[in-house]
A protein has these predicted regions:
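Intrinsically disordered, low-complexity Ser/Thr/Pro-rich tracts
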Residues: 1-100, 108-113, 117-120, 126-128, ...
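Beta/coil-rich, acidic/histidine-enriched accessory regions frequently appended to metallopeptidases
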Residues: 21-22, 28, 32-57, 61, ...
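Juxtacatalytic substrate-recognition/specificity segment
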Residues: 159-290, 298-323
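Extracellular beta-rich ligand/substrate-recognition surface
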Residues: 172, 470-481, 505, 555-564
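Acidic/His/Gly-enriched intrinsically disordered linker/tail segments
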Residues: 231-243, 260, 264, 279-345, ...
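Extracellular beta-strand-rich recognition modules
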Residues: 495-503, 580-587, 680
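Extracellular carbohydrate recognition and processing domains
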Residues: 525-574, 660-664
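Terminal, low-complexity interaction segments
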Residues: 560-594
Length: 700
C-alpha cells in the first residue's frame, strides 16, 4: 500500500459503480441488524479491477476435511507446551528487543515545532464550528494513489446534517435524494454503531466542529474506494496539504451512494478515523482488521478479502504489503483473525479495549484477553495456532470449540470455506513460511515417519551489521524513533560526520533524518548528505531525508530490490566551537512500513587534522552515551520459533489436535501408524521481522 492513508482497495471492492450507475434512480439503502446476515448476496456484486489483475479466488465446492465426519471423540493434547526456544537466553533476547522497540506515536504538531521550524504550531486550526451552508463551494486537497500526486479539487456542500457534511466535487452528477439518504443512513445507523463498537473520533477536532466532512470526488487512476488521512486532522501550518477537517474521501468512480458498497466503505473508513484518535500508532494489520470487522458488524459481511487469504494462507498476519495485489490477502488475514477474536473473546464490548491496549503492536493484549477464557493460551503463537486450526477445521464440536467460528441463527457464517492443505508424498520437501503465516500439509497415510528440520534463527531485516552490532530504528506505523548523542565541537576547526547506513523506507512517505540541535533539543536542523533528498510531495520530509532503498537511487520498496550498505558523509563545520546534540530520526506515517534504518561505524572528525576525532563508535562496545528511544542495538538475527500442530485421525476414526514441540535445533519427529491420517500445520512465529523462515520435511 503505497501511501500514508488508510484505504480500501478497489481491486476487490464489490459493486463498484459505473458512469451509468451514477445517474440511476436513487436506491433507498437501509442496513440490516448489525450482526445478522447482509440483505444482499455475494453473487449480486461484481469485482472492479481497474488496471490490475486480481488474485484468483478458489472455485468449486468448498473444501472440507475428508474425515471430519468420522470424529466420534476428540482430545486437546499438549497445548500447554509451545514450540519455543529451549534456552532462556534466546527468549530474553526477543523480550529485550521488544522492550527497546517501543516507538512513540508520531505527533505531527511536535515534529513541526522541532523539525519543521513552526515554533508556534497549534493542535487545532479553529475552536468554533465551521460556518457553512448548503451550496457553499470549497477547495480540498486530494491525493491520487495511482499518480502519487496531491492536488486541489473544488467541491460543493450538498448536505449539512447533525453528523455529516457531504461535499461533491464539481462536475460529478449525483442524485440529491440518493446522497441525502446515504448521509442519513450514515448518521443514524453507521455512525452510532461504529462508535459503540470501537470508540470515538476526535471531537471537536482540528476544525472545532463535531461534524465529519465526507468529500465525494474522483481519484484519477483508480485503486482506491475511500481513504482517511490523519494529515487532515492537523492545521495546514503543520502539513501544508491538510484540509483542516475530520474527514474522509470517497471515490465516486468506484463506489456510488446508490449502492450498499458506498455505505460499506463509510463503515470501513470511519473505524480508521476512530482508531487514529483512540490509538495513534496502531499497527496497520490490526487497524485494517478492525475496519473490515466494522463492515461486518454494520451488516456488510462479504468474503472477497477472506477468500483471497484462504487461497494463500502463507501470508503474514502481522505485516502488510504496499503492492495492491498482494495487500488483498493481508486484508483477508486481518479480517478473518478479527472475526475469530470477536466471536471467541471480545464480543461487542471488548474491541475498544484491544485498540487502547495497542494490541497490534502489543500482541500480549490478545493473549491476556484469551487466557481469561482459556488459561492454556500463554503466547501469541499459541493463539495464532488456534486460529490457523480453525481455518482448516471449523468444527465447533472438536475439543472446546476453539477450532471454529461460532455462529448463531441471527449471525453470518464467518468462514465461507476452509483451507485446502497441500498433498505431500514420500520424500523431501524444502519450503519457507512467513512469520505468522501458515503452511498446511495433508500427509500420506501411515505408517510413516515425518522429520521436521526448521531454521533456528532468522534475519531481522534481511541484512547484517558490518561488525557484530548496529543500531536499528525498529519499524512501525505512524511512529518515531530517535537516537541522540552529545558532541562537543569545541577546539575543532572543521568537522565531518561519517557513518555507514542501510535502509528500506517507504518512498515519499517514511524518512530518516540526521539532525543537530544547539538549543538543548528544542529545535533541530536536518543535515544534507550524499544520499539525502529534499523532495517533499506529501509534507512528510522535514528538510533533508533518507528515503527509498539504500544503494538504489530512485527505487522504491515495492520493487523488491533490497537495500545495500552505503557510507554517508555530512558537513558539521557550521557548528564548530560549541557543544551540540546529534540525533538520528526515523519517522513513519500511517498505513505501511518497511524494514527501517540501520546505522554503524559513526565518526565525527576534523576534515583538516588527521585523527582528530570527537566521536568514534562502531557500536560494538554498548550503548555508551547514546540515548535510544525506539532504536535498538542489534546483531541482525532473532531466534526462530515454531508452532507445529498435527490434526490426527486414528485408525479408529478419533480426531485430535496435537502440539508438536521443536527442540533447540528446530527439529521434531512425527510418527503415524497403520491406517492413521494427519494434516500438519506449520507456522513460524518470530516477532519484529518480515523475513521468511526456512525448513525441511522428510517423509519416509
Amino acid at each position: 500500500m503505497h501511501k500514508y492513508i488508510l484505504l480500501l482497495l478497489t481491486v476487490i471492492l464489490l459493486n463498484a459503480c459505473s458512469a451509468a450507475d451514477m445517474q440511476s434512480p436513487a436506491l433507498q439503502p437501509t442496513l440490516p441488524p448489525p450482526t445478522s446476515m447482509p440483505t444482499r448476496s455475494e453473487a449480486a456484486f461484481t469485482t472492479a479491477i481497474p488496471d490490475k489483475t486480481a488474485i484468483p479466488l478458489p472455485a468449486g465446492t468448498p473444501f472440507r476435511l475428508p474425515y471430519s465426519e468420522l470424529a466420534a471423540t476428540a482430545e486437546l493434547a499438549d497445548l500447554a507446551t509451545s514450540a519455543q526456544p529451549d534456552t532462556e537466553i534466546e527468549v530474553d533476547k526477543v523480550a529485550a528487543l521488544s522492550a527497546a522497540l517501543q516507538r512513540p506515536p508520531r505527533d505531527q504538531v511536535e515534529l513541526a515545532r522541532a523539525l519543521g521550524g513552526v515554533t508556534d504550531a497549534s493542535a487545532v486550526a479553529r475552536t468554533t464550528p465551521l460556518d457553512v451552508q448548503v451550496g457553499d463551494v470549497e477547495q480540498f486537497w486530494v491525493t491520487s494513489t495511482a499518480t502519487n500526486r496531491t492536488y486541489t479539487v473544488t467541491a460543493e456542500l450538498r448536505y449539512a446534517g447533525p453528523v455529516a457534511l457531504m461535499y461533491v466535487e464539481q462536475g460529478l452528477i449525483i442524485d440529491q435524494a440518493t446522497l441525502e439518504q446515504a448521509a442519513r443512513v450514515f448518521e443514524e445507523q453507521i455512525y452510532p454503531r461504529t462508535r459503540e463498537l470501537f470508540g470515538s473520533e476526535l471531537q471537536p477536532g482540528v476544525d472545532g466542529d463535531l461534524r465529519i466532512t465526507i468529500l465525494n470526488g474522483r481519484s484519477p487512476g483508480g485503486g482506491v474506494a475511500g481513504y482517511f488521512s490523519s494529515r487532515d486532522s492537523v492545521p495546514s501550518s503543520v502539513n501544508r496539504f491538510s484540509n483542516e477537517r475530520e474527514m474522509f474521501f470517497m471515490n465516486i468512480e468506484s463506489v456510488n451512494p446508490a449502492n450498499p458498497s458506498y455505505l460499506q466503505v463509510l463503515a470501513h473508513e470511519f473505524q480508521h478515523m476512530i482508531h487514529w484518535n483512540e490509538q495513534r500508532n496502531a499497527a496497520i494489520w490490526f487497524n485494517e482488521g478492525c475496519s473490515t470487522l466494522s463492515e461486518d458488524l454494520n451488516g456488510f459481511v462479504t468474503h472477497s478479502f477472506v477468500m483471497a487469504y484462504l487461497a494463500n494462507p502463507n501470508t503474514q498476519l502481522t505485516a502488510w504489503s504496499e503492492v495492491p495485489e498482494r495487500a488483498i490477502a493481508h486484508y483477508g488475514a486481518a479480517n478473518l483473525f478479527m472475526r475469530y477474536i470477536y466471536t471467541h473473546y471480545t464480543g461487542e464490548e471488548g474491541l475498544v479495549d484491544l485498540i487502547r491496549a495497542n494490541a497490534g503492536n502489543n500482541p500480549d493484549a490478545f493473549v491476556e484477553l484469551a487466557a481469561r477464557t482459556r488459561p492454556d493460551i500463554t503466547s501469541f503463537g499459541t493463539l495464532f495456532a488456534d486460529w490457523a486450526l480453525a481455518n482448516v477445521l471449523n468444527d465447533p464440536h472438536l475439543a472446546d470449540g476453539r477450532y471454529s467460528y461460532p455462529t448463531g441463527p441471527d449471525e453470518p457464517e464467518w468462514l465461507p470455506t476452509t483451507v485446502k492443505p497441500r498433498l505431500l508424498n514420500i520424500g523431501t520437501t524444502d519450503n519457507t513460511v512467513y512469520q505468522f503465516g501458515v503452511n498446511y500439509y495433508a500427509l500420506p497415510d501411515g505408517p510413516l515417519t515425518v522429520e521436521f528440520d526448521g531454521a533456528t534463527s532468522v534475519s531481522l531485516v534481511g541484512t547484517e551489521p558490518h561488525g557484530t552490532y548496529a543500531w536499528w530504528s525498529g519499524r512501525g506505523d505512524n511512529s518515531v524513533s530517535t537516537l541522540t548523542h552529545p558532541v562537543n565541537l569545541e577546539g575543532l576547526d572543521s568537522a565531518v560526520l561519517q557513518f555507514d547506513t542501510w535502509y528500506e523506507l517507504e518512498k515519499h512517505y517514511d524518512y530518516a533524518f540526521v539532525s543537530v540541535s544547539v538549543d538543548d533539543g528544542t529545535t533541530w536542523q536536518t543535515l544534507a548528505g550524499m544520499h539525502t533528498t529534499n523532495e517533499d510531495p506529501h509534507g512528510a520530509n522535514y528538510g533533508n531525508g533518507l528515503n527509498g532503498v539504500s544503494g538504489a537511487p530512485g527505487v522504491d520498496t515495492r520493487s523488491g530490490i533490497r537495500g545495500s550498505w552505503v557510507t554517508e558523509t555530512m558537513e558539521l563545520s557550521a557548528y564548530i566551537g560549541q557543544p551540540i546534540l546529534l540525533r538520528f530520526w526515523q519517522i513513519s506515517d500511517d498505513a505501511f512500513n518497511a524494514p527501517g534504518l540501520l546505522i554503524d561505524n559513526i565518526r565525527i572528525c576534523s576534515n583538516t587534522v588527521a585523527d582528530q576525532c570527537v566521536l568514534e563508535d562502531d557500536v560494538e562496545a554498548g550503548y555508551g552515551d547514546w540515548q535510544a528511544e525506539g532504536f535498538a542495538r542489534i546483531d541482525g538475527e532473532l531466534p526462530q520459533t515454531w508452532e507445529l500442530r498435527l490434526i490426527h485421525t486414528g485408525a479408529d476414526g478419533d480426531l485430535s489436535v496435537r502440539n508438536i514441540p521443536t527442540d533447540s535445533a528446530g527439529q521434531a519427529t512425527i510418527r503415524l501408524g497403520t491406517n492413521e491420517r494427519a494434516i500438519l500445520v506449520v507456522a513460524a512465529t518470530t516477532p519484529h521481522t518480515t523475513e521468511p523462515a526456512s525448513y525441511q520435511l522428510r517423509i519416509q
